[in-house]
Each structure stands twice: as C-alpha cells, then as structure tokens.
Regions:
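Intrinsically disordered, low-complexity non-transmembrane regions of multi-pass membrane transporters
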Residues: 1-19, 25, 71, 75, ...
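Entry/N-cap segments of selected transmembrane alpha helices
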Residues: 32, 108-129, 280-307, 358-362
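Hydrophobic transmembrane alpha-helices of secondary-active transporters
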Residues: 34, 57, 84-109, 243-246, ...
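Interfacial helix-loop-helix linkers and transmembrane-helix boundary segments
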Residues: 39-48, 66-67, 81-82, 102-117, ...
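Alpha-helical membrane segments and immediately flanking helix-loop junctions
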Residues: 88, 96-102, 117-127, 131, ...
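Alpha-helical transmembrane segments
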Residues: 167-185, 295-303, 326-327
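Membrane-embedded hairpin module used as a gating/binding unit in multi-pass transport
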Residues: 175-251
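Transmembrane helical segments that form the transport core of multi-pass membrane transport proteins
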Residues: 223-310
Length: 383
C-alpha cells in the first residue's frame, strides 16, 4: 500500500500542475489567444500557429528548452536545438532564401522610385533605436530592438544573434512576428489618418513589362553592390538574391520549388516553435519585455507613417501620379503590407488596383531592413 501511495505521489509530482506558476498560466492564456487569432481570424497562421504552440509547450514543460550544458546527461530539450539554429543565424538566412524564391522583383525593377518608399519606411527602425536608448537599453540592445520597426522577424533574430543579445531575442522575435501578423489591424488607421479620400482614390499607371534579362541581372547586381558596400549583409541579402536567381533563371526549377515550398515550410516550423519557446514566464514577463513590445509598436507605426508621408511627397512631385497608400508597404512584411495598401485603396474605389504598385516598396523594404541591420553590424564592428 505504501508503494502504491509513493508511486501515485511521484506521478502527481511529475505533472505540470504541480509546477505551474501564475506567470505560466498568463503565458498559456496569451498562447491560446494567438492560436485563436490565427485559426479563427486567419491572422498569418503560418507564423502565429507555430509561435503560439512553442509558447504553450515551454510554459507547460520548461525542460523542452533546457540547455544542453544545464542537463544532467548533457542532452538539451528538443526546442533548444531548434533555437540554436536561430542563434547561429542559420534559420533567418534560410527564410530569406525561401522568400527570394517566392518574390517577384518585377514591380521594383519597373519602378525604381519604389526604393525611396522602401527606404522611407525604415525611419521606424531609427526611431526605435533612439527610443530604446532613451529607455536605458545598451546601444547593441537598442539596435537589435529597433529592427522590429521594419516588421521583419528573420532580420530581427539575425541581428539579435549577431550582436549577442540572446537575452532579449525572444521578446524581440515575438514582437516582430506579432506585428507582422497584425499589419492588417495596425496600418489602416494610420494610412487613413494621413491621406485624404481623394488621394486614396488615385489610380496609378500600369507598370511597364520587365524583361527576363533584367530579372536575372537584378539579383546579381544587388548582391554585388550591397554586399560590397556592406559585406555583413551577405547572409541575408545574398540568400534573398540567390533564391530570386533560382526563380528567375528558369534553369533550376527543382531548387526553386524546394526553396519556396518544402524547405521554407520546414524552416518556418523550426523558427516559429523555437521563437515561441523563448517566451517562458520567467524570461518574458518583465518590464524589459513590455518596453520592447511598446517600442516595436511605436516604431512600426512610425515606419508606416513615414512611408505614407513620403508617398504624399512623391504624389505632389509627380502631380498626382503616385497613390500615397503604397508608401505604407515600405515595411518589409511581405506581402501583407502590400495587401493592406490594396485593401485600403479598394475601400475608397473598388476599381483601384494597387497591389502590384505596392509590391515595389514592399520588396524594397526587405532589402532596406537587411541593409539597416548590416549598417548596425558595421557600426559595432560585428562580422
């Protein structure tokens, strides 16, 4: 009888119920909200579902993120090994490879002025950097946090790893991916506030056709120019352009399909679950996390506003040929931000089709965010 009693006692002690804290319950509730938003309302489920489930797992069973050196037998938890690939910047670079294989740079090639809108939207990054410094973060931590303003999860993870800011990598990544998912909610009020209905109704001229030669030369030229000026961007820009060269060359169909489908989705699973697993209650529920989340929101709003305002300047300079709404797509949430530009424009005029025009600034924003990350790395002497 004593044996049975001891066995039952041990079993009860091993359950998660005996170890759950109030903080764990809060994070489990947050994970469930994320799952609800992703499944019920379709808020970027490819991102939110794995992130939320990783969040759920680590707050029920913390040892799933146990570091190998902290383990009695030298074996870490499953998601710890996924997370190591984040720290080594492998997964963010592979994400860029997949994004490149899926991206059409045609709108950007056809309208190079889109680069200016993509650059303007990066203002949010530097606003976040100054804000983080003002809040007492170190210069490297501020730089890592600031990339949230570009709404670029992989680049946020990449820079945090390179600057050795692993203590705040989890909150940075969750904030960046959350704001990427919430683009359809955050951006429209800002876009409508800064534009008139007349501006939102502006119809833009159809983009010129882009030749196959231009499409092939673009990733090669961008790689040479950007990586020569900022060699530290090579892992991101290089992989982005390699993926795009796969797509546009037309001679490596199998590589294109693998990079844009199977590999991409495998990496999303690994990246999403490992990012979610960094949000244990002990690591996530603190004032620094709240500051990071707040800074990210402010930075993203600033980036959106800067893009729209620069779009208004271009509208004035071209005598009404540019719809300012496409400026908000300069953040690098591809293709969510471009879809939002299309949606807001269509609300003003259902016959207005802005998607392809917005894709120019959108893909320019991807390059711009990577360049901003490379600039910070160069400033801090990181290779």
């Amino acid at each position: 009888m004593e044996y049975i009693s001891n066995t039952l006692g041990n079993l009860i002690d091993q359950t998660a119920f005996m170890n759950l804290t109030v903080g764990n319950l809060i994070m489990i509730a947050v994970a469930c909200v994320f799952l609800y938003l992703a499944i019920r309302h379709g808020f970027e489920p490819l991102l939110l579902v794995p992130i939320a489930f990783g969040m759920l797992l680590v707050n029920i069973y913390p040892d799933i993120m146990l570091h190998a050196e902290d383990s009695a037998n030298g074996t870490g938890g499953l998601l710890y090994y996924f997370y190591v690939l984040d720290e080594w910047s492998i997964l963010p670079s592979l994400i860029f490879l997949g994004v490149g294989a899926m991206t059409d740079f045609g709108p950007l090639i056809a309208n190079p002025k889109s680069f200016l809108l993509g650059a303007a939207a990066q203002f949010g990054i530097f606003a976040a950097y100054l804000g983080a410094m003002a809040m007492g973060f170190s210069d490297k931590a501020a730089a890592a946090i600031s990339i949230i303003g570009g709404a670029d999860g992989p680049t946020s993870i990449f820079l945090a790893g390179k600057l050795q800011q692993t203590a705040i990598l989890g909150p940075i990544a969750v904030a960046a991916y959350s704001y990427m998912s919430l683009v359809p909610i955050i951006q429209p009020p800002i876009m409508k506030l800064l534009t008139t209905e007349k501006e939102r109704k502006i119809k833009m001229e159809q983009l010129r056709p882009v030749s196959k030669l231009e499409r092939i030369l673009f990733p090669i030229i961008v790689t040479i120019v950007v990586c020569t000026i900022l060699p530290t961007t090579a892992p991101l820009v290089g992989m982005l352009m390699l993926g795009n060269l796969f797509k546009e060359s037309g001679v490596v169909r199998q590589l294109t399909e693998t990079a844009s489908n199977a590999l991409m989705y495998i990496v999303v699973i690994l990246l999403g679950t490992s990012v979610g697993a960094t949000t244990s209650a002990e690591a996530f529920l603190n004032w620094d996390t709240l500051k990071i989340v707040a800074l990210g929101l402010i930075a993203f709003a600033f980036g959106t506003a800067a893009g729209v305002l620069f779009g208004k300047i271009m509208c004035w300079a071209t005598k009404g040929k540019v719809n300012p709404l496409i400026g908000s797509a300069g953040v690098s949430a591809v293709p969510m931000a471009a879809r939002v530009s299309q949606k807001v424009g269509a609300e003003a005029d259902p016959t207005n089709f802005l998607l392809m025009h917005a894709m120019g600034p959108n893909v320019a924003g991807v390059i711009g965010t990577a360049v901003a990350a490379g600039t910070f790395m160069a400033i801090f002497g990181v290779k």
